[in-house]
Amino acid sequence: MAVPKKRHSKRICKIKFYSWKSKFLKKVQFIINQKSIIKNK
């Protein structure tokens, strides 16, 4: 019983990590866009 539980928690960690990563990348993209807009003005 303990082994599948571990595997499942690993999968949850992976999903959490990827959702955090995508949020972070979106934030970075937003900052880059803001900077480029400021440069263009």
From Swiss-Prot:
What's in the keyword line of the UniProt record? Plastid, Ribonucleoprotein, Ribosomal protein
Q: Where is the protein found, in the record's own terms? A: Plastid
Top-level taxon of origin: Eukaryota
The record's GO CC annotations read:
plastid; ribonucleoprotein complex; ribosome
Question: Its principal location?
Answer: plastid
Which protein family is named in the record?
Answer: Belongs to the bacterial ribosomal protein bL32 family.
Q: What is this protein's record name?
A: Large ribosomal subunit protein bL32c
Origin organism is Helicosporidium sp. subsp. Simulium jonesii (Green alga)
Taxonomically, what lineage is the organism?
Eukaryota, Viridiplantae, Chlorophyta, core chlorophytes, Trebouxiophyceae
